[in-house]
């Protein structure tokens, strides 16, 4: 493993383990004799398992019912691959599951097939512990070595960068339940360059899950993936319940088979859950709060809402304050000023913000509220790695030019308090809401955001990042909030974490504020340092001298 690139450090050399003892410690039920899983004179694999085993497509996806034994069949295929010499297509295989128990169950199946296929390997199982310097935690991996071929099968954690620098086939198990599936697939697909395959196996986890989106892309002809669909009824027709009866030493009968199948459906929490778990029908709501259809219906068909991006160059912080100010001022006048000048004075305007200093994005979303109370995104500003002062500069440039500005809501969590306070000092608490993002806040305001979509009362920019960010809103313990996953920005250069979704929700919250309307006379009545047009004012700069040491 390329540990330097992956920020993983081996804590000890690989050591051989007793598979039964390890399984006992983790409470995993394993089979160590192929005769326990295969009746005499019957094929090892059931029909759907055999079809999956034999599929040589470079990218294969299986949407399946629970506990149909597809990973077991995949283990047999992987042993064949790793045991062959390179000249016959042999290579390493890397398995990515979401839990240690899954990894051990898979490795146990690989060991079973390695022994069953005779002299292909000694089938010893090894473990090795690595220290993840990013997550500050230990990661345990299991491995089977094949001395004749020189290849191995290794079970890794689901951290995407673990695949960087590796070469071999990749198996992603229960893919729909990985937090960073998009990053994981990106890392896995890179291995295709040298002929390796990617095998993706999962039960569904909602219609808006990336796993389902990949399946739809394949079925609609946009991707060249091979897709297998294995419902519980498909598996039963191919002999699953008969095989279960053999392994568990129960008598089989058609009546018992029907009762078993009907009991699974009857005892599911509800019909939608049963259809998803056993029928390969993803829930319409899934974990996502806003459906893809609902989001796309709110997107402007004319593509006339611009998304403006400013990413500070690498040497930005080494420039003088005057140079940074000049660069940003030029950008504001070239990019923002024409859009601000074009805003209608007949509409009220509010703004929502999501803050980040490094890594994620700061997003400003101005909303126009028309006389008939419809809301429309005016434009969007996305800032990456921009200094605090220049974020303030851009913010005040916008706020001071919004016609009939009535309020703004800011993410004041952590360092976000800086921008929120800067705006509040100028416009006052009646106009600026400084918000600490909590489950209680999400529970109150996310439903109002959803209501705007359901009432078709909001128009937003038509862009892939719009969709990606809004799909990050997931229901967790009954509360709609931003999930832990991340997506790549346009061009794949930076991370996103639902930044636009938070900013848009903030803007909707600002639309409920009752601040007075800021007009030209009001602006001129403010003291000079409160107008937002004199960012070099000494008094205001002195106020923020704490910035360098405080953040």
UniProtKB/Swiss-Prot annotation:
Where does this one sit in the cell? Host cytoplasm
Name the enzyme group at the top EC level: hydrolase
Its GO biological process terms?
A: provirus excision
Induction of synthesis: Expressed in the late phase of the viral replicative cycle. Expression of late genes is activated by the viral late transcription activator C.
Record keywords: Endonuclease, Host cytoplasm, Hydrolase, Late protein, Magnesium, Metal-binding, Nuclease, Viral genome excision, Viral genome packaging, Viral release from host cell
Enumerate the InterPro entries for this protein: P-loop_NTPase, Phage_Mu_Gp28
Tell me yes or no: is Magnesium among this UniProt entry's keywords.
Answer: yes
Question: Is the keyword S-adenosyl-L-methionine in the record?
Answer: no
Per its UniProt entry, which superkingdom is the organism in?
A: Viruses
This entry's Enzyme Commission designation comes to 3.1.-.-
Cofactor binding annotation:
Binds 2 Mg(2+) ions per subunit.
Q: What does this protein do?
A: The terminase large subunit acts as an ATP driven molecular motor necessary for viral DNA translocation into empty capsids and as an endonuclease that cuts the viral genome to initiate and to end a packaging reaction. The terminase lies at a unique vertex of the procapsid and is composed of two subunits, a small terminase subunit involved in viral DNA recognition (packaging sequence), and a large terminase subunit possessing endonucleolytic and ATPase activities. Both terminase subunits heterooligomerize and are docked on the portal protein to form the packaging machine.
Family as reported in the entry's similarity comment: Belongs to the T4likevirus large terminase family.
Protein's recorded name: Probable terminase, large subunit gp28
Annotated source species: Escherichia phage Mu (Bacteriophage Mu)
């Amino acid at each position: 493993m390329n540990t330097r690139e992956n920020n993983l450090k081996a804590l000890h050399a690989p050591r051989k383990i007793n598979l039964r003892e390890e399984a006992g410690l983790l409470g995993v039920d394993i089979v160590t004799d192929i005769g326990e899983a295969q009746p005499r004179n019957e094929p090892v694999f059931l029909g759907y398992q055999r079809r999956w085993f034999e599929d040589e497509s470079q990218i294969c996806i299986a949407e399946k019912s629970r506990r149909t034994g597809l990973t077991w069949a995949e283990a047999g295929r992987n042993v064949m691959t790793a045991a062959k010499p390179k000249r016959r297509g042999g290579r390493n295989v890397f398995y990515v599951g979401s839990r240690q128990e899954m990894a051990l169950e898979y490795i146990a199946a690989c060991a079973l097939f390695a022994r069953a296929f005779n002299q292909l390997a000694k089938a010893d199982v090894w473990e090795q512990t690595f220290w993840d310097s990013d997550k500050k935690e230990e990661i345990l991996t299991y491995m089977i070595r094949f001395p004749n071929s020189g290849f191995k099968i290794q079970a890794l954690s689901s951290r995407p960068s673990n695949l960087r620098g590796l070469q071999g086939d990749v198996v992603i198990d229960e893919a729909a339940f990985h937090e960073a599936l998009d990053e994981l697939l990106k890392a896995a697909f890179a291995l295709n360059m040298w002929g390796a395959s990617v095998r993706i196996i999962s039960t569904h986890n909602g219609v808006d899950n990336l796993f389902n989106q990949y399946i739809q892309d394949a079925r609609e002809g946009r991707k060249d993936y091979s897709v297998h669909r294995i419902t519980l009824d498909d598996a039963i027709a191919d002999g699953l319940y008969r095989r279960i009866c053999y392994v568990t030493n129960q008598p089989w009968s058609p009546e018992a088979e029907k009762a078993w199948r009907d009991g699974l459906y009857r005892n599911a929490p509800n019909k939608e859950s049963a259809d998803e778990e056993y029928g390969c029908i993803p829930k319409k709501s899934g974990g996502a709060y806003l459906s893809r259809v609902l989001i796309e219906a709110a997107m402007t068909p004319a593509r006339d809402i611009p998304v403006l991006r400013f990413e500070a160059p690498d040497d930005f912080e080494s420039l003088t304050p005057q140079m940074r100010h000049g660069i940003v001022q030029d950008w504001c006048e070239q990019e923002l000023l024409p859009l601000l000048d074009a805003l209608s004075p007949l509409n009220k305007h509010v703004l929502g913000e999501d803050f980040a200093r490094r890594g994620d994005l700061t997003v400003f979303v101005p909303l126009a509220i028309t006389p008939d109370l419809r809301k429309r995104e005016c434009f969007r500003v996305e800032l990456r790695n921009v200094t605090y002062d220049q974020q303030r500069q851009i913010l005040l440039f916008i706020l001071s030019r919004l016609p009939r500005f009535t309020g703004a809501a800011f993410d004041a969590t952590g360092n976000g308090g800086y921008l929120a306070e800067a705006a509040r000092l100028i416009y006052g608490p009646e106009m600026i809401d400084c918000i600490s993002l909590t489950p209680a806040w999400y529970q109150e305001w996310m439903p109002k955001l959803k209501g705007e979509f359901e009432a078709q009362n909001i128009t937003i920019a038509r862009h892939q990042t719009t969709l990606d960010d809004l799909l990050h809103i997931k229901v967790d313990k009954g509360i709609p909030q931003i999930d832990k996953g991340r997506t790549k920005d346009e061009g794949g250069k930076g991370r996103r974490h639902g930044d636009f979704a938070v900013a848009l929700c903030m803007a909707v919250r600002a639309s409920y504020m009752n601040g007075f309307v800021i007009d030209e006379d009001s602006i001129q009545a403010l003291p000079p340092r409160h107008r937002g047009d004199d960012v070099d004012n000494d008094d205001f700069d002195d106020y923020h001298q704490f910035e360098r040491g405080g953040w």
